[in-house]
Amino acid sequence: MKIIDLLTKEKLSLSFEVFPPKTQSSYDSVKKATEEIAKLKPAFMSVTYGAGGGTSKYTLDIAKNILQEHGVPTLAHLTCVSSTRETVKERICDIKNSNVKNVMALRGDIPSDLQNSNKDSWDYKHAIDLIKEIKEIAPDLCVGGACYPEIHPESANQDEDIKYLKEKVDAGCDFLTTQMFFDNNLLYNFLYKIREAGITVPVMPGIMPITNANQLERAIKLSGSFIPQRFKSLVDKFGTSPEAMKQAGIIYATDQIIDLFANGIKNVHVYSMNKPDVAENILNNLSSILN
């Protein structure tokens, strides 16, 4: 099933993101974790792509397994920043020839060895280049793109960011998923601005349950997310107690999702990080709301 078809339904839904193994030795444990999440029957599951393509060879394998063994629609991530055009075309064809109907088109983080290189030598400089390639090779694939309620780290300002986002959508993005955020008002303001700019495709908020203090530090470093005082206080109080922090983080994420549903959002994507217990707890917290 195409994700765009799921997103146009009136039913409230939750989906989860997982990541592939980094090595063959961890394949079985990662596969088991993703299958445990698939058994919860989310609306769909997305499978990430390693930085610089590092774990890319397992992305489609995990996505196909979830779909074939558990009947859960999947979204395979694809990045392009450090890849040749030949390699990317091959991977697009692999997805096209599988039963996976959805692809998340991302530029990807720039590897350290390319930070100071000449971008003119890259086959792909931006996600829009990848989106156009996918639409040319596999026009029937449903294509997702990323968006940033708090502005892309490389954009000069939000107006520039939204202008580029509109270009991505015009190039063929069927839906958008947001970077993590911890203050829902940032999302609501962002949605107003992009609708004013003529971006009409569905937007799925991305929610990251923070279950330990170190995870929060990494999240801030990666995304630059604003941390509201309410969440800072939570981490200050419970951050040194693993079980308390885990429970508090799950409840905070659940509260965010409930508020999103209450304010007209129908579909929320949870960055569950291969943690079946976290995914299950959030689903249990929302069971009556989702049903």
Describe the residue ranges of each PLM region:
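Active-site-adjacent beta->alpha loops and helix N-cap segments on the catalytic face
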Residues: I3-L6, S25-Y27, G53-N65, T84-E90, ...
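Active-site beta-loop-alpha junctions enriched in small/polar residues
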Residues: V18-P21, T48-G52, H77-S83, G108-D109, ...
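Active-site pocket-lining/capping segments in soluble small-molecule metabolic enzymes
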Residues: S121-W122, H126-Y148, G198-I250, D255, ...
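Active-site/ligand-binding-proximal alpha/beta "capping" segment
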Residues: E133-F175, I251-N263
